[in-house]
């Protein structure tokens, strides 16, 4: 991202369900800013600027959060949506220290058509996100997996995923991110 986005929020005094309902009725979104040092600040933000920012950066980019005139680097940490309307009902911001690594989820994008799919196999995506550890300013937008060389009954494991410099995958077990399985008809034919 070439230019850091910014979002202005205000601190809020009213806490609880009733106060939050009033904010939402006034086209405001209640939220909480969690500082890297453990300080929690209840905030409110206008819905439209928040919606625009979230559609541009989601949860994978640092932006400048302006709280009552003070600018702090932050991530959109958690967003709650209305169950039937396209509205954000609550947002959590996480203040980051730009010099310390953080753990975040990054979406996986699969490109290409595998050898196994060409032969009739089924692509199975096991993980849509990968947990990574990196500095806040080098969080990748997405992790692209080229699957053109994956054959039937083969997988791409997390240890095989090529990540940008300064980004490390977080995992205990070497799990499969994607795999190509034999189709049901092929599997039945082999068993007969």
UniProtKB/Swiss-Prot annotation:
Pfam families: Ribosomal_L25p, Ribosomal_TL5_C
Chain segments annotated as transmembrane: none
GO biological process annotation, one example: translation
UniProt xrefs under PANTHER family: RIBOSOMAL PROTEIN L25/GLN-TRNA SYNTHETASE, ANTI-CODON-BINDING DOMAIN-CONTAINING PROTEIN (PTHR33284), RIBOSOMAL PROTEIN L25_GLN-TRNA SYNTHETASE, ANTI-CODON-BINDING DOMAIN-CONTAINING PROTEIN (PTHR33284:SF1)
Free-text function comment from the UniProt entry: This is one of the proteins that binds to the 5S RNA in the ribosome where it forms part of the central protuberance.
NCBIfam families xref list: bL25_bact_ctc (TIGR00731), PRK05618.3-1 (NF004135)
Subunit structure: Part of the 50S ribosomal subunit; part of the 5S rRNA/L5/L18/L25 subcomplex. Contacts the 5S rRNA. Binds to the 5S rRNA independently of L5 and L18.
Protein name: Large ribosomal subunit protein bL25
Originating species: Solidesulfovibrio magneticus (strain ATCC 700980 / DSM 13731 / RS-1)
Lineage summary: Bacteria, Pseudomonadati, Thermodesulfobacteriota, Desulfovibrionia, Desulfovibrionales
